[in-house]
């Protein structure tokens, strides 16, 4: 019963690749779980979903681990969730 199509930006794909290369299977499973959840529940469930404020207004985040967040936006008109980042804390370098 998927409602949304999940699309990863190039940055999110690179971040996901870095997580895979780290060898941390728990993080890999968590990211995979988040991507599946986003198809149905982009605003609730695991990872403490949070609407972001200020310059990131319109984006949401989910906690991957203490250091990393999955950042995404939801477009209800075209039923799409765009994941823009999966590494770092709100675009910190």
Where are the regions that the model predicts?
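A short, surface-exposed loop/turn module that caps and links secondary-structure elements
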Residues: 36-62
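Residues that recognize and position ribonucleotide moieties
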Residues: 5-6, 45
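Enriched for short, Lys/Arg-rich terminal
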Residues: 1-5, 13-29, 62-93
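Residue-level signal for threonine
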Residues: 9
């Amino acid at each position: 019963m998927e409602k949304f199509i999940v699309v990863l930006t190039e940055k999110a794909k690179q971040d996901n690749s870095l997580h895979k290369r780290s060898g941390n299977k728990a993080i890999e499973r968590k990211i995979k779980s988040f991507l599946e959840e986003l198809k149905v529940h982009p605003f609730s469930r695991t990872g403490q979903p949070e609407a972001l404020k200020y310059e990131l207004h319109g984006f949401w985040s989910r906690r991957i681990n203490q250091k990393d967040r999955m950042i995404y936006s939801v477009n209800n008109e075209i039923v799409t969730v765009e994941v823009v980042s999966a590494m770092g804390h709100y675009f910190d370098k």
